[in-house]
Every structure is written in C-alpha cells, then in structure tokens.
C-alpha cells in the first residue's frame, strides 16, 4: 500500500514539475535570428510585439499582419525586401496576412490555419503551402509570382481567388 501511494505521489510530482517549463516554452518565443531569420521581418515582429520576446498574450492580439513592401517602408523606413517569413508559425492567430511586394520564394502557412485573407502578390513564389488538414482561407491574391501549381482542396471557404 505504501509503495502504491509513493508511486502516485512521485507521478504527481513529475507531472507538476514539468508544467511550468512546458507552459513557458509554449508561450514565450524569443524574436531572434534563429526563430525569425529574415532581419526585416524580425525587426517588424519586434516592433509590433513591443519586445524581443513574443508572448502568447501578444500573439493572440496580432490578427492582422501587414508586411507588404509599402507598409514596411511606412513603419520601418527604407529596408531591403523580406525574403523569408520563417517564424510566422509563432503568429498563429493571424487572420489577415499581406506580404505583397517582397522577395519571397516560398511561403509556408501550414501552421497558420486561421488565415482568412492572404495577399502574397508581387513576390517570386514558387511554393505556397497551406494547412493540409484544412484552413479558413476565404480570399487569396497570389498574382505576379512563379507558382506553377496550387492545391486549394483544403480551402472549402475560399470565395475569391486572384492568381
């Protein structure tokens, strides 16, 4: 009987000792060159986060992400074009994404299933990946790119397409 109680207590201690670590790892993402390798995208995310760490609370507030060339110029001044949106997966609550006029060659939104409106026109995209389990995409503008194929089979809510 004592062994059983001891086993239960040890299991509970193990579970509760892992909770704070797991919670902090999931809710705080450093905005650094490892998570956001493109320097301009990283600078923009730092600006909208108001910090060098993206908290879960702040990520929830970011539903509109405008990293279009014109908005970057307005917010940050003259900068080189963005070539990668790697790290966008940490902005999982974004519903409206505008990344037009940059120099993106790939755009991976497989972990951004909440995106409803996407404007990625005027890039050099050869690949656009959407969540293969399904997504919320309603409006897609992807003209002036180098896409040769686009799988929209998991986008049942799509009502407007301009490519």
Language-model segments: which ranges?
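N-terminal capping/linker segments that flank leucine-rich repeat
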Residues: 5-10, 16, 21-96, 113, ...
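Conserved hydrophobic beta-strand positions in leucine-rich repeat
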Residues: 65-68, 75, 97-99, 116-120, ...
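N-terminal secretory signal peptides that target proteins for export/translocation
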Residues: 1-2
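Short helix-onset patch at the extreme N-terminus, typifying the N->h transition
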Residues: 7-9, 141-144
